[in-house]
A protein has these predicted regions:
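Receiver (REC) domain active-site loop signature in two-component systems and cognate sites
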Residues: 63
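Active-site beta3 strand of CheY-like receiver
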Residues: 52-58
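Helix N-cap/capping motif at the beta->alpha junctions
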Residues: 37-46, 68
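C-terminal output helix
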Residues: 112-121
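Short amphipathic alpha-helix used as the core "switch/output" element in two-component signaling
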Residues: 46, 69-81
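Two-component/phosphorelay signaling modules centered on CheY-like receiver
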Residues: 17-36
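Conserved acidic carboxylate
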Residues: 14
C-alpha cells in the first residue's frame, strides 16, 4: 500500500459502543489519519456506498442482524478492494475458511493488542 499511518483512512465496525470507543482511541493515539465508526454491518455497507475510499475496514464478526462475514461479502460485491480485517473475541477460531469465504484479509483478536494493530496497519 505504501501509505503512512497518518494518511490511512479506516472504517471500524462493531455493535458494542465501548469497543468502538476503545478502537477509535487506540487508532487516534497511533495517529491514524481518519477513523470513522459504525455500529452494524448494514451501517458499514451504507458507509462504503457513500465513501468507497477507505484503506481498511476493521469488522467485528459477531453482530446482530448481519454478522461481519455477511457484511464483508456484500461490501466486496460492491467492488471494495481495500483490506478488510476481522475483529473477533473467538480465540478458538482455527478454521480460517469462513474468513477466506468472506474475502477478509486478516484477523485481530479481542481484546485488541496494540502491537497486533500496528502489524495489521503496517501489513507486516
Amino acid at each position: 500500500m505504501g501509505k503512512r499511518i497518518e494518511d490511512l483512512s479506516l472504517l471500524v465496525v462493531d455493535d458494542n459502543a465501548i469497543n468502538l470507543m476503545l478502537m477509535e482511541d487506540i487508532l487516534e493515539m497511533m495517529n491514524v489519519g481518519e477513523v470513522k465508526t459504525v455500529d452494524s454491518g448494514i451501517g458499514a455497507i451504507d458507509e462504503i456506498q457513500k465513501n468507497p475510499n477507505y484503506d481498511m475496514i476493521v469488522m467485528d464478526i459477531c453482530m446482530p442482524g448481519m454478522d461481519g462475514y455477511e457484511a464483508s461479502k456484500k461490501i466486496r460485491h460492491l467492488g471494495y478492494t481495500g483490506r478488510i480485517v476481522a475483529l473477533t473475541a473467538n480465540v478458538l477460531t482455527t478454521d480460517d475458511s469462513q474468513f477466506k469465504e468472506a474475502m477478509m484479509d486478516d484477523v485481530l483478536l479481542k481484546p485488541v493488542d496494540l502491537n497486533m494493530i500496528k502489524k495489521v496497519l503496517c501489513f507486516e
